[in-house]
UniProtKB/Swiss-Prot annotation:
Pathway: Amino-acid biosynthesis; L-isoleucine biosynthesis; 2-oxobutanoate from L-threonine: step 1/1. Catalyzes the formation of alpha-ketobutyrate from threonine in a two-step reaction. The first step is a dehydration of threonine, followed by rehydration and liberation of ammonia. This is Threonine dehydratase biosynthetic, chloroplastic. It comes from Arabidopsis thaliana (Mouse-ear cress). The gene is OMR1. It is an enzyme of class 4 (lyase). The lineage of its organism: Eukaryota, Viridiplantae, Streptophyta, Embryophyta, Tracheophyta. Residues 1-91 form a transit peptide. GO terms for cellular component: chloroplast. Residues 419-490, 512-583 form the ACT-like domain.
Length: 592
């Protein structure tokens, strides 16, 4: 698979108009897509009207599924641009100076760089963990928040700060405000679990619950900032926030014992990887800076692929700490010039890495906190790396307790130690016994069977496996006995919903199958029913909570083909994210 060739970036961080021997004003940290014209005039000059600003280009909206590649493969590799090769030395020094002179250690610790002995032995490399989960708020986020806030003028800080967040950034801002003696308002979605907003409140901040989503909370926070004179503290897209996160890279280069092959960094909005790259690539350019994203929340990979920032039309919410639809402007500018590519990992792999960390250090990471570890392991396996030093940043440990159920269910699947299978079995005496004999000594961890009126039934089951050959041998035994067997392990639809709905097949006509994301708040179900019932008959409903990001709901609705346009209009008006899965082969196998 070839690396993606990106168009050359226009190099201009500083846009200004000036005349010889006149003062010059420079504005840093604006991309070439948002140029600002500035006229600096002496007293004897007449006023000059700058050209009208160009309207911003509409952002490209894309699906996460439009860019997928094998686990561990280093994709979305940007071509080095002229800006990267001949970038401003002054700009590079600005970030380096900011990082080196930071005051984040007023509040943050220098987190340890620990060897993961069990993982290192299993992979044949020296795997080091940068333990940002050990920070006072169990996340790296306080570094960037504090670095920006401590630099605010005293009069501005006295007015207070505001931010929007459902998690780690909120705690970072709240703790920083407490340290600096200023007020902080934290706007969080109403779907935020009580344990999270109470943790922020306990740090002394004022919590405002607003909106069903982060976007709504952010919009409200920015309005309040404007109306009340508060300073908005962004979660990632600000030079001082980026520099604060960059101290992680500074520490790694100081703590590393021997040359590093790569540093694996979880990517959401891009603040952490931009900061690390801004430092490490200037002092140790040979070290690879590799981003890791969930396969269903790959905004950075897609932005690098298209050569511009894009917006995801949907974003997976399991790793909620990195579940963003759009990366930052400044973070993208730095990342496309300095990072080496992106590794994509599945939810199963993230769960496996949470288990790896528990077995290694007896600590439980949140999904986003285990993301880099999952990417590092997949990368080492894919490229067959041996005897090199790699670092994975364990970025956070604010685990939502409700998600532990999902983690325990999927961890062995992610380790490729468990497989989910379906076998078609004839409805006749003795067939069940024959099936069990063919499974043989393999451990069955889950088994679902329901007698059907049809000539054959579907058995859904999970088995423990030690090698890929063992699984292939089982499938071969089944097929040789005329029992068709399908491996369903990679299907999220099966693992989230269909495995719990084994009550027999249905012959319902005109059934439209959809996966909706319901906000976790009272009244969400009734809002849904008001949109579709009694207009159409609901034929299937399965709810699966995933924590604060919302509930994953599988819905079947009888909608005649000629009424599909009306159905889509009602679904759009409802405002819940959804997509159609009616044509899924596994749904047809198990349910129809």
């Amino acid at each position: 698979m070839n690396s993606v060739q990106l168009p050359t970036a226009q190099s201009s961080l500083r846009s200004h108009i000036h005349r010889p021997s006149k003062p010059v004003v420079g504005f840093t940290h604006f991309s070439s897509r948002s140029r600002i014209a500035v006229a600096v005039l002496s007293r004897d000059e007449t006023s000059m009207t700058p050209p009208p600003p160009k309207l911003p280009l509409p952002r490209l909206k894309v699906s996460p599924n439009s860019l997928q590649y094998p686990a561990g493969y280093l994709g979305a590799v940007p071509e080095r641009t002229n800006e990267a090769e001949n970038g401003s030395i002054a700009e590079a020094m600005e970030y380096l100076t900011n990082i080196l002179s930071t005051k984040v250690y007023d509040i943050a610790i220098e987190s340890p760089l620990q060897l993961a002995k069990k993982l290192s032995k299993r992979l044949g490399v020296r795997m080091y963990l940068k333990r940002e989960d050990l920070q006072p708020v169990f996340s790296f986020k306080l570094r960037g928040a504090y670095n920006m806030m401590v630099k605010l003028p005293a009069d501005q800080l006295a007015k207070g700060v505001i931010c929007s967040s459902a998690g780690n950034h909120a705690q970072g801002v709240a703790l920083s405000a407490s340290k600096l003696g200023c007020t902080a308002v934290i706007v969080m979605p109403v779907t935020t679990p009580e344990i999270k907003w109470q943790a922020v409140e306990n740090l002394g901040a004022t919590v405002v619950l607003f909106g069903d989503s982060y976007d709504q909370a952010q919009a409200h926070a920015k309005i309040r900032a404007e109306e009340e004179g508060l300073t908005f503290i962004p979660p990632f897209d600000h030079p001082d926030v980026i520099a604060g996160q960059g101290t992680v890279g500074m520490e790694i280069t100081r703590q590393a014992k021997g040359p590093l092959h790569a540093i694996f960094v979880p990517v959401g909005g891009g603040g952490l990887i931009a900061g690390i790259a801004a430092y490490v690539k200037r002092v140790s350019p040979e070290v690879k800076i590799i981003g890791v994203e969930p396969a269903d929340a790959n905004a950075m990979a897609l932005s690098l692929h298209h050569g511009e920032r894009v917006i995801l039309d949907q974003v997976g919410g399991f790793a909620d700490g990195v579940a963003v639809k759009e990366v930052g402007e400044e973070t993208f500018r730095i990342s496309r010039n300095l990072m080496d590519g992106v590794v994509l990992v599945t939810r199963d792999a993230i769960c496996a890495s949470i288990k790896d960390m528990f077995e290694e250090k007896r600590n439980i990471l949140e999904p986003a906190g285990a993301l880099a570890l999952a990417g590092a392991e997949a990368y080492c396996k894919y490229y067959g790396l041996k005897d090199v030093n790699v670092v994975a940043i364990t970025s956070g440990a604010n685990m939502n307790f409700d998600k532990l159920r999902i983690v325990t269910e999927l961890a062995n699947v992610g380790r490729q130690q468990e497989a989910v299978l379906a076998t078609l079995m004839p409805e006749k005496p003795g067939s069940f016994k024959q099936f069990c004999e063919l499974v043989g000594p393999m451990n069955i961890s889950e088994f679902k069977y329901r007698c059907s009126s049809e000539k054959e039934a579907v058995v859904l089951y999970s088995v423990g496996v030690h090698t890929a050959g063992e699984l292939k041998a089982l499938q071969k035994r089944m097929e040789s006995s005329q029992l068709k067997t399908v491996n369903l392990t990679t299907s999220d639809l099966v693992k989230d919903h269909l495995r719990y709905l084994m009550g027999g097949r249905s012959t319902v006509g005109d059934e439209v199958l959809c996966r909706f994301t319901f906000p976790e708040r009272p009244g969400a179900l009734m809002n849904f029913l008001d949109s579709f019932s009694p207009r159409w008959n609901i034929t299937l409903f399965h709810y699966r909570g995933q924590g604060e990001t919302g509930a994953n709901v599988l819905v079947g609705i009888q909608v005649p083909e000629q009424e599909m346009e009306e159905f889509k209009n009602r679904a759009k008006a409802l405002g819940y994210d959804y997509f159609l899965v009616s044509d899924d082969d596994y749904f047809k196998l198990l349910m129809h």
